[in-house]
Amino acid sequence: MRMKNPPHPGLSVRYDCLKPLELSVAEGAKVLDVTRQALNNLLIGRAGISAEMAIRLDKAFGGCAETWLRMQAAYDLAQAEKKAGTIKVKRVAERAEPVHA
């Protein structure tokens, strides 16, 4: 079952990765080989987890790159669904079969 309002994955990075190891933002950025600002933007929800950042998080803290990306996708979808009523599109055709990923 999908969460209706999942938290930004930056919170998981902060509380599940950095905090237990008592790492500061600067120390975490050094571990991940990113700028302090880039990590801070992720932690405060200004930036999302890219595929590259997911690999960095996987290598540094575990958790599987795919899982980090799924967390970001779930958050992004929940945010988009909040605005779904404002998205104006015209249906072109009905599908005979559902699209599968």
Give, region by region, the residue ranges found by the protein language model:
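A short, Lys/Arg-rich alpha-helix, primarily the initiator
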Residues: 1-23, 70
